[in-house]
A protein has these predicted regions:
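N-terminal beta-alpha lobe that positions the nucleotide/phosphoryl donor
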Residues: 1-219
């Protein structure tokens, strides 16, 4: 199994694989070569420079590492390419097992804008905001004024708490909008963002679901 991630999640995956007697491959950027997950894995491959776009989000480099090590499965961990339908599809096409959802389902729910659209189509209430991604800063600012501050700028491909900016005042908007787009590109390889009304100290219900080929359970 090649672990397409770093840090704590990569360490936890490697530890689980060791318990099952499964060989592991760690990938790393040039500055992560001495990281714990690299030292723990059976093999390691450098996939690029310290910028995530050049390493942990670099699909061609990851595919080369898979081929080089004859890996037959990939665990994406969380963040990075874990919700990238294109990566999952490329693995499927190359008969490499992706330890995660299918590319079809990632495409439906991994992209926050698409997920929100599907929720609305199925009659679920959603938070007030843009209908899709906003590219033009003028359009985005106009919509934010209509919704009313504070607002939240969110990366379409974001996850794990990354890719979000809270804007409390109109004069802060342009700066945060630009930062949100550049961070979305840096961390998720996609600079598309959308806007939602921000709620201070909200409560939400989260359901954890574990699914295999033939059954699914909720916790």
């Amino acid at each position: 199994i090649l672990i397409a991630n770093r840090g704590e999640i990569a360490v936890r995956i490697i530890r689980a694989c060791k318990e099952w007697g499964i060989p592991t491959v760690a990938v790393h950027s040039d500055v992560d070569r001495e990281s714990m997950h690299v030292r723990m894995a059976d093999e390691s491959v450098c996939i690029g420079s310290h910028q995530p776009a050049n390493s942990y989000l670099n699909i061609p480099a990851l595919m080369s590492a898979i081929e080089l090590t004859n890996s037959d499965a990939v665990h994406p961990g969380y963040g990075f390419l874990s919700e990238n339908s294109n990566f999952a599809r490329i693995l499927e096409e190359n008969k490499i097992n992706f330890i995660g959802a299918s590319s079809k389902h990632i495409e439906m729910m991994g992209d926050k804008i698409q997920a929100k659209k599907i929720a609305k189509e199925n009659g679920l209430p959603v938070i007030e905001g843009s209908e899709g991604g906003v590219k033009d800063i003028g359009e985005a600012k106009k919509l934010s004024k209509k919704i009313g501050f504070p607002i939240l700028i969110k990366a379409s491909g974001g996850g794990g708490g990354k890719g979000m900016k809270i804007v409390y005042r109109e004069e802060e908007f342009e700066s945060f909008f630009s930062t949100a787009k550049s961070e979305a590109q840096k961390y998720f390889g996609n600079d598309e963002v959308y806007i939602e009304k921000f709620f201070q100290n909200p409560r939400h219900i989260e359901v954890q679901i574990l699914a295999g080929k033939n059954r699914a359970v909720h916790l």
